[in-house]
Amino acid sequence: MEQYKRILLKEFDSRQKVITELTNLEAILNLPKGTELYISDIHGEFEAFDYILRSCAGILNEKIKDCFGDSLSQDDKNRLSALVSYPELVLKEGNKSRDWYKDTIPQLLSLLAFAAAKYSRSKLRKALPPQYAYIIEELVYSDTALADKKSYFENILSYVIELREAVPFILGISGSIRRLLIDHLHVVGDIFDRGAGSPQVMDELLHFHSLDIQWGNHDIIWMGGFFGSKACMLNALRIAARYGYLWDIEKAYGLNLRALTLFADRTYKTNPKFRPILGHREVDFTAEEILQLEKVHQALTIIQFKLESQLIKRRPEFQMEDQVTLDKIDYWEECLTIDDKKHPLINTCFQTIDPTNPSELSPEEAQAVDSMLASFQGSLKLAEHINLLMKKGSMYKIYNQHLLFHGCIPLEPSGEFQPLMIHQAHYVGRKLLDFFEYHIRQAAKNKEIGDDFSTDLIWYCWRGKLSPLFGKDKMTTLERYFIEDKETHKEVENSYFSYRNSEKICQLILEEFGLFSQESRMVNGHTPVKTGKGESPIRGGGLLFVIDGGLCEAYQEKTGTAGYSLLNNSYGFQLVTHQPFQNAQKVVEAPFAQTSLKKVIENVEQRTLIKSTSIGQILMAQQQELFALLHEFYDF
């Protein structure tokens, strides 16, 4: 503590400096809070995710309307919206004249000033591109109603254009506008899997100015694989093969899948059940490429099932002996008995299975797995992405008195918290999530060991009965591949998913996490909201928002929308309903046609100031430290 005081004294070495900083902090605390965007279940759909950020989930169009009113035509508003959202595309369209720049840049500066109105000058300065910060500030705060200032403004603008700096200048201003409109981003899990663009999503998050992440079940298998869990890695790669983006992942992360590909090509033949699900991307694949993915998909699936059988045997404390594994198959009759009913097997690809020891890897499989793991853990880009997940991520987040988590808080059928009994201890509610997070961080410390308890527990997070990220009694992947009877495919959801409609239970969960404010809410992802069937994203008497992004094209037929995101500004919450995203060019051509539908959920009685937020708590703590300094050293 004494050392900290010495550091503080070095920075604030006079009474006036302390007073100035206290005044600055008080000014910031009394400004309105910034706008937060909550988004979930991106599932590798980079372009749709990128559009939500570029359009600021519809806020951009609203700000343009509010800023310019009737002074701009609808066509001009369209063009301005497209420019701020996708400046790179708009600036490439045709040759822009000097007059176009002289008309457009002042509009951008007006919009920037409008977006910055509720922030301090310091906040605006931090949002500006450093190379243009001084000049943009000068232009933003110039009163062009005064003749001298108008001339000053026009001269600076002309000089920027003459220096051929107009394009990077516009790019910088557009980025600053978007940054001011979304002050903080919450990603409520499942960045990975289904779509090919997870690496691009992670790259964008790496450079986002302020964010937090709540881990999802599909994120956890990538983390587990990187930390040494072969079972997690095989799940991640199998899903990539199933949805046809394995080669995209291989290229993006520099993975070496050659040993796997050669082994699969030698061992397997065509099997329609393992044909990749490509959707509209099927036209991009040749018949040979599809066959190759079929073979690789089979290889990854069988290896995954072998590794999972080994893990379940290794971890009796997981209490998963009732799960269907390769050991329970009758290979002579090719059938599987579940609940005393015998089921014939279909789509089988058991070439490498020894019926006397089904979970043992063949030498070629073992070599392929070792090669994949070395490649997985050796990828610099993947390491960068996993580091971001660890630095910004957690099992849950309490932010501004709201509770964010991806999956569920396991509950008994009675509505009580469901305990995980393990190693002579039991964990429920908040302690259950803390238990999993502790072991995930332990596994990250030593990725050379892949079969320790902490690393195995990451795999349990993926599919364990009491995993807050999974939320079902079992995962029936093996049954779905090899048994026709759909009764065997059923996965029963945890009681949480029915109880989350109860205001009483939602209040109980909030209080479990120390949240007793009437303004506190929960934000949850994981399960698509089936709007077409009358489901609402608002649950529990308004205490819970379910915001599965629905960006994944495969879900949109079920949901009837491209999902939801949530906005929270100083006036309250707004629920945003997204329409299916086509492509960036369509947005450039008709940005207001893509406008997201907003629903104001609740307005606060008084505008929320920074002093009432999580950041405000940090700033007020700094104030207390400075007051203590003032009293102790400057005779205040």
Curated annotation (Swiss-Prot):
Pathway(s) the chain acts in: Carbohydrate biosynthesis; gluconeogenesis
Catalytic reaction annotation: beta-D-fructose 1,6-bisphosphate + H2O = beta-D-fructose 6-phosphate + phosphate
Top-level class of the enzyme under EC nomenclature: hydrolase
GO biological process terms, semicolon-separated: gluconeogenesis
A single GO molecular function term of this UniProt record: fructose 1,6-bisphosphate 1-phosphatase activity
Keywords from the UniProt entry: Carbohydrate metabolism, Hydrolase, Manganese
The protein's required cofactors: Mn(2+)
Pfam families: FBPase_2 (PF06874)
Similarity comment: family membership: Belongs to the FBPase class 3 family.
HAMAP family: FBPase_class3 (MF_01854)
Protein name: Fructose-1,6-bisphosphatase class 3
